[in-house]
Swiss-Prot record:
Pfam families: Ank (PF00023), zf-CCCH_AtC3H23 (PF25512). Residues 322-337 have a biased composition (Gly residues). InterPro entries: Ankyrin_rpt, Ankyrin_rpt-contain_sf, Unkempt-like, Znf_CCCH. GO terms for molecular function: DNA binding; zinc ion binding. A zinc finger (C3H1-type) spans 213-241, 249-273. PROSITE patterns: ANK_REP_REGION, ANK_REPEAT, ZF_C3H1. GO terms for biological process: regulation of gene expression. It comes from the Eukaryota. It comes from Oryza sativa subsp. japonica. This is Zinc finger CCCH domain-containing protein 67. Signal peptide: none annotated.
Amino acid sequence: MGEPGGAEAAVSARLLELAADDNAAGLGELLAAWPSLADEPAPWYTPARGAEPLTPLMVAAVYGSVGCLDALLSPPYLVDPNRASASSLSTPLHLAAAGGSASAPAAVSRLLAAGADPALLDHLQRRASDLVALPPNSLPLKNHLLSLLGARKEWPPDPSLPDIKNGAYASDDFRMYSFKVRACSRAYSHDWTECPFVHPGENARRRDPRKYHYSCVPCPEFKKGAGCRRGDMCEYAHGVFESWLHPAQYRTRLCKDGVGCARRVCFFAHTPDELRPLYVSTGSAVPSPRGALEMAAAAAAMGMGLSSPGSSSFTPPLSPSAGGGGGGGGGSGGGGAWPQQPSVPALCLPGSAGNLHLSRLRTSLSARDMAVDELLAAAAAAADYDGLVASPASIRSARGKALVPSNLDELFSAELAAAAASRSPRYADQGGAAFSPTRKATVLNQFQLQQQHSLLSPRAAAVTPEPVSPMSSRLLAALAQREKMQQQTLRSMSSRDLGNAASLLVGSPVSSSMSKWGFPSGNPDWGADDEELGRLKRCSSFELRSGAANGNHEPDLSWVNTLVKEPTPEKMMTTTSAMDSIGILGQNTSRDHIVGGEDDTAGVISSWLEQLQLDEMVV
C-alpha cells in the first residue's frame, strides 16, 4: 500500500515541475503512463501563497505555460478549467491573472476558450479580473488582460449546438426535467452557456426532480456559500436554477420584461397564455395530495374514466411555447444533428395520488352501474328470501357469523322449529309450501338469472365485477344441499305422517343431537327392559310425540291398534334384533359426524325410519 501511494505522489510532483517549466513533451510522456494523474492536486510552494495543493493545470496557469495548457485542455485529458483549489477556492483563471507572467494574456485566452468562467469567486469573493497584477510599464498588456477577463466570450456560431430558445429544448418539460440535468457528451470545448446540458464543475448543475424529491424553497445552508451538509439528499433547492426551474414554480409568474425579454433561459412566463396553473392549496403549480384525492373521488362519483393507470394527476399542462418559440432569436437547425428528446414522465412526489392504484375505482360494481329494474328485482329477491325465514331474530344472529357446517344445524333448526310450531299434524298451514323444493328451485333460478342479467347489462359491460363473496357462495351451497337432503328424505318416506316427522327431524335439534348417541357407561347394552318395550308400544309413530309436545289433539289411531299386539317371546327376540340395528346405526352416525359426514344425516335418518317402519309392520 505504501509503495504505490509514494509512486503516485512522486509522479504528481514531477508533473507540477514539468508544467512550471512548460515542458509539454515531457508532460505528455508522463501522462501517457499515468493518465489518471492529469487532474490530481499535489503540494506546491509559492512565495505569496506558501504550500498549497495545486493541479498541473493550475501550475501551468501561474507560470503562463501555454504549451502545457494546450496539452491538458485537449483530448484525451480534457481537464476541468473551473476546478478550484481546496484552500483558497482559486481557479486556474485566478492564478493566471495573478501570476504576473508575460504570457498571462495567452494563458487566459486558452482557459477562456476551454470554458473557464471569469465570474467565479475565490474565498475572498474576488473575481479573476480583480487579481490582475502586472508591472506598471506593462499597461497595454494589463488592459488587454482586463478586456479578456471583463468581456463575455463571444463564441463562433456552432451549428451542432441546439437552440435553447426554440424547439424541443425550450419546452416546459425539457426545462423542468432535463435542462442542466443530463450530462453533455461533447468531447470538445464549447460555450457552456449555450449548451442545455450540464458539464463537470458547472454551477448551473441541477438535481433531477424525478429522482430527488426536493422543494423549490432555497436551502438556507447553501445560500451561505459553505455548502449543504446533506448534499443531494437535501429537501431544499440548491441554487437559482433548482429553485426557479422546479416544476412547482417554473413559469407561474409573469416576466417583468414581457415579450421583450432578452434572457437565454427565462424562468417566467412572457404572456398570460404561458402561465402554468397555480393551485391555491399549495401556492405552487403542483396540487396537494388531498386535492388530488378529492378530484379522483369526484371523477369516480361522476363516472368519469381515467385515460390510463399510469397517468398522474400531477401532470401540468404544457405551455404554448412547447411547440414553438419562447422568445426572440432564430432557430439554428439543431434538430437535425440532435434527436428529439423523449417525453419526460410527470413529476411524482412522495404521497402523491399518482402512486395510488386508481384502477380499483373502475372494478367495483356499485348501485350506480345497475338499472332501476335490476335494483328492484334484487330487492324483491332479498325480501322474498327473508320472508321464507320464520324466526328473524335467530337468523339475524346466525347471519352475523361465518356460514360454516357447524352453523347449519343452528340456522335450519331455527327455521323449521318456528315453522313446525304453527303447523297442524296434517300440513294444514302453507309454510311448508314455501320450503318446498319447487319454491326453492324457483328462488335459486331467479337469483342466478338476476346475476347473469346484471353482468350482461350495457352499463355493467365496461365494469369488471368483483368475484362473488364467500358468504353468498356458501349460502347458495347450503340451500342446494338442504334441498337435496329433503328430496332424498321425501323419496324414502312411505306415508305422509312419516314424511311430516322426517321433515321436522332434518332441521330440528334432534338431528344435531343424534351425533351424540352413545352409551353413558361406555359399555354397550343391547338388552331391552319392559319399560322400553312399553314406551315403544305406546309411541309407534313420531307424530304422536310431535302432537303431544305441541298440545294438539290426538288423531284417530285405530288403524295402529290393529297392528300392535302384546309381544310374545319370539317377537321379543325380533324387537331385540331391531334395537341392535338401531344401536349400530347410532354408532355409525356418530362416527360419520366426527369424521365430518354431516351431509349424510338425511340418508341416515331415512334408513332408520324405514327400518323402524318395517319392524312395526312385523310386530
